[in-house]
Amino acid sequence: MACGFRRAIACQLSRVLNLPPENLITSISAVPISQKEEVADFQLSVDSLLEKDNDHSRPDIQVQAKRLAEKLRCDTVVSEISTGQRTVNFKINRELLTKTVLQQVIEDGSKYGLKSELFSGLPQKKIVVEFSSPNVAKKFHVGHLRSTIIGNFIANLKEALGHQVIRINYLGDWGMQFGLLGTGFQLFGYEEKLQSNPLQHLFEVYVQVNKEAADDKSVAKAAQEFFQRLELGDVQALSLWQKFRDLSIEEYIRVYKRLGVYFDEYSGESFYREKSQEVLKLLESKGLLLRTIKGTAVVDLSGNGDPSSICTVMRSDGTSLYATRDLAAAIDRMDKYNFDTMIYVTDKGQKKHFQQVFQMLKIMGYDWAERCQHVPFGVVQGMKTRRGDVTFLEDVLNEIQLRMLQNMASIKTTKELKNPQETAERVGLAALIIQDFKGLLLSDYKFSWDRVFQSRGDTGVFLQYTHARLHSLEETFGCGYLNDFNTACLQEPQSVSILQHLLRFDEVLYKSSQDFQPRHIVSYLLTLSHLAAVAHKTLQIKDSPPEVAGARLHLFKAVRSVLANGMKLLGITPVCRM
């Protein structure tokens, strides 16, 4: 695997540079493949060496690269050494490259790339990831969908790297909307509708009561009183609220299952209605709580009255706010999990909110506030189903399934499937996830169903098609050829390009683990699929001599394995037929 070759190169460099091999590992990177020319397999960035050097005179880097290359020697691992633009390049012995990469992919299976030396020495951590977090009775909007798939990716990757991950869905299950919802259900609610479709019915009630409250002050007052009863622990009010919450969570679990997403804990703002009062007392005891003329309580994070740094933590009637409950939740999670890192995945509109929450934790004396991290993402515009704006996650999933079924029906090569609905949903979800993950998470983008479902080009449909096609090859030829293979049979440019690309998988995983951007993995998998498409046309298995056919089948099997591994990390279930 790449790290074995990296170490061999690092050991030779360490003797010349008088540096420990460990210091050189991350400076040696696999070279991205080129369609125009054959490239080396690894390169050493001379810039990065000079950054490690305390001598800042920085002589001509190209001269330095040439001098260094002249001191190095080819050996059983490295067959050629050359210089590039500010780099020293290394070509690996071709037979060794073929044998090592294919053996490693087959032996490591789903762990390929994750055992790399790039990750060795990194401590195993306990990581809390809070994501999805819809509001009960309100729309499950596109922001919640993005939070769900991004949070799931981060949790998947961290878990694959051996960290202990706790996935939390922090529901919006408290606040004034429940005053409206409780009052609304007493006025317009139906028990049968609630039991049969809780999310839909609660949303309908919520929309109706909001209209009524806008026109009728007595309804607005009743809603306010209902929420105050909830805050005071009234048994009847709490019983109704609990029913709404339990039925909603049951429905969420069912729908998340279709997405392939699960949570270790369904938490919510309601858990912290009492603990938020303790937070207010602590803020007051530290002299941080200020009262306004309106009777609200605020914290001045600037210390000099800067209006942009004022954070409201209590309403005039003494009830808690979102920020107060987030503070209580963070403190509770540290007590419960003693986490090393806590990651919040929400849209970029909440950036200031989390900055203030983390800052308040710090001035309250919690040094671990530095372990809290916000992963923000941009806005998606224009995602609509045929029924109109997205209201529920299930609307999106049903739309995906319907559109993909229609696409599959219109394509002549579509196979006969045991469960076309399931396949359509998996392919459609891959399409949705790849469209979302192709760019920077922070970027806004305009959604297009037509672009999502293109079977050609850089789409999720193309990834699924490639996986299914490679699986079909294994089904057709696998039994007879998957024994020992001759590495000398994989020296064509198409084979070498694939092997070079497989070398890079650990670096791509490392990049994504550092910046939480799935685009590195997406770009890698799309390139791998394009390479496989070219190889599928030129590297025939049928009618080839057995040892050639066997070697090629091993190569395609390795591609399919790595493709499946990457897709699963992104939250995509690979399909075997489509």
From Swiss-Prot:
Which superkingdom, per the lineage? Eukaryota
Q: Which PROSITE patterns match?
A: AA_TRNA_LIGASE_I (PS00178)
| One annotated GO biological process | arginyl-tRNA aminoacylation
Q: Which CDD domains match?
A: ArgRS_core
List its EC numbers.
Answer: 6.1.1.19
Q: Which cysteines are joined by disulfide bonds?
A: none
Binding positions for L-arginine per the UniProt entry? S133, P134, N135, H144, Y322, D326, Q350
| InterPro entries named among the record's database cross-references | aa-tRNA-synth_I_CS, Arg-tRNA-ligase, Arg-tRNA-synth_N_sf, ArgRS_core, DALR_anticod-bd, Rossmann-like_a/b/a_fold, tRNAsynth_Ia_anticodon-bd
Return the similarity comment.
Answer: Belongs to the class-I aminoacyl-tRNA synthetase family.
Under the heading NCBIfam families, the entry gives: argS
Protein name (record): Probable arginine--tRNA ligase, mitochondrial
